[in-house]
């Protein structure tokens, strides 16, 4: 079959936007479905806006009809014809009331039989879909996500441009500096044995831009981190990156709140109430057992240490004596939902997180308590009262150090919330998490390590603790959390040269290391720096939530898989020996 050309024709309308008025149109797209009914043929033509039905009648134009008989699924077509009402209306389609009676059909490209049905691929193996990603990207669901992501990027630029931000590009090849994850390294051909690093973030460059006087910076920045993947993480991602001078934390948060309000109203029609609620890190952990709390439902953690301190139960007593606590969550209706076997699974899950075990009170017809023999008169009633329990509830209790108890109950809270169906769909609960810990304790190496990049400003009232009490140092850093997912992180930056030196020293860096890794930035601060701070918002993750997608793969055109490879192009791959020689690189074989 000889293929046609577009000569003499140009598209007048997208398929999903063909008007209902009678007029001549030219549409282009992929053949979605072909129905041959003898003397009639109907072809659903698909493009990124939707479908339109093409109609062919052998009595009207035999030549065009015969060409339509050649069409198969996924052929690329161009069709000219008159819009007319359909005999049978399809209410599911935007163009379901009309069809195009075709007078000129062009077959521009043929398709072999596809390895899966493009528009019905939900049950198709993910590996197969990723291998043929260009076909899966034709799926209307996936196209809708990609187009929504485009709209998010468009609104993002509009908002920040309107608020005086300058979009400035920062280098993609930079010096390797410690930022938490492993760098992707790029060997230099010109400088043998030396490497560039792909940016984990534009952090250093955007701070230099503030020192340079560009007081409002924005960039949709590509970032790279060589770390293990999960459902909400990719080795390369896009960050809505911003920095502001002559501001404080509240100014930056107010700017972001305005952006969130505009974005959710324009994309989803959702009204976001401002200002967004705030929780300190300590309060978030105490109430929800997480620094990324899902606040769409209750089931908050209750501290019952004082209530149970006199109960002669060694699990409780040893935890309290060791400076820990006894805390609980009340799973409303959980006694009815959870069987004893399912409760045992919760216990095992708690152990998997790090807890030694889990006590419980299952109040069905009668209270069934896992530590009943240790209870004195009135103890059970006191516990029930402390957590607001009533008949039908399940109380889960954990006793240990707070760093074990809180994340354990926080994880169980989410599991039980999903199991009971109490987490509302279609609800968007934002919360700022503030006053983040400045240091984290590394049990393995028995030392305090930085919880943030080394340019994060400590809170003024905590400066005296830097040398004496690292556990009490809080940072001028914050996260924006939506429905239990961290959307963004931000902080105020250190602008005092001496404090920055002290911070490097607190992180165990020698003068030589400081000079080698950050010498150019330290030098820049010698020439004065305005007060500044900024944030990074994950565009991929934001898109995933707005699109209600299950994975970042559903909002990224060409994603990587769990082992950081791309199945479609089979990368990473080996390269020619000549290329390696030019880069002064030799490879060694690794036994698998």
List PLM regions with ranges:
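Class II aminoacyl-tRNA synthetase catalytic cores and aaRS-like
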Residues: 1-592
